[in-house]
Structures are given as C-alpha cells and as structure tokens.
C-alpha cells in the first residue's frame, strides 16, 4: 500500500478572522470544515475510488462480484442474487444510494409483501434487509448505476492511515495581502485484502465479501 496525500487549502482576510462570531480555526477543524470534507472524501474513495492516486474502492476492486440487475431499479430478486454471491460467513452491511430511499421502502416481493425493509422495534436498531443492516448514503452512485446497491463486509477491506488529518494556519503565507491561510493534509490508502473473488470447494462457484448490483443484463 502507498499512502495517497489529500490536501485542502483556503484563505480568509484578517478582518474576517477578527470579526467572525465563531472561531474560523475551530470551524475549519470540525465536521463542517476542511477536516469533515476530507473525512467525506475518504469514505467516498473507499466505495468509488479508482486506485489511481487514491484508495481502491470496492466498486472497482478485482475481488468484487457484480450481479447483473433484472430491470432498471433494484428488485427483490436482485437483492436475493446478491446475497447468494456474498461470502456465507461474512458480516455484511448494505450500502444503498440515498437516491433509492423511497424505492427501497416500497419494494414488494413476488408474494406481494408490502415491504422488505423496516426498522426494528427496539430503539436505536438499524433498518434490516434480508438479515443485514442497511446504511443509506450519498457516497454510493446515483440510482440505476452500477454500485447503487452494495453488500460488503468491511473486515476484508484494508485501510492504511499514515497521517491523521491536520489543519494548520499561518499569517505569513499571504502576509502582504493581510490574509490568513489554512492547510489541511491527510495521507491514507485503502483496498480489499483480496485481489479476486473466493471459490467454493467445487472450484467454480465464486463468492466474495464485496458484492455490488451491476448493469442490466442484456
């Protein structure tokens, strides 16, 4: 693994720094500032990263199995096929595009069941789908694109954090312009432990801890 560097940079006039009702330094180091933005990009790369100058996301990994979808929107048979290709001993979690939220809640099975996705009656319990917890996220591709539905066991994903996010400021970078500058730096890499899917004992049937819903079958 080779840690990839992500850098953020911004400036503000010294008047803004002095007159701001909040501490800009604290804001930029918080979840809504540069540190939060880098954390968002890191999660995005673990899902959709190409591996070129950034982590290799599960969607583009060689170990991932892509299951052809039956139609355009995800269907119940699609999800069953994904579970069938998932590592039996895996501790899977569904990652589903936020753009599919309404579609998933209204999904019906072949017997006309109203919904296969609902929250547990216990307070704080996550939504469950076919026995696996569900996370809706905007970090997945938009609906009807490969990877809009992912079933993953992140124990099989290797993350190498070489440098935690640091946010530093200086008044000397743009001193003659009466400005303060901030720089955020983070170094990380990530990729699945596996380079290809696993096989059952028959040596033919593939399974994987990473399964995505792919393109429509032709």
Model regions and ranges:
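Structured, hydrophobic secondary-structure cores that serve as assembly/anchoring elements
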Residues: 1-218
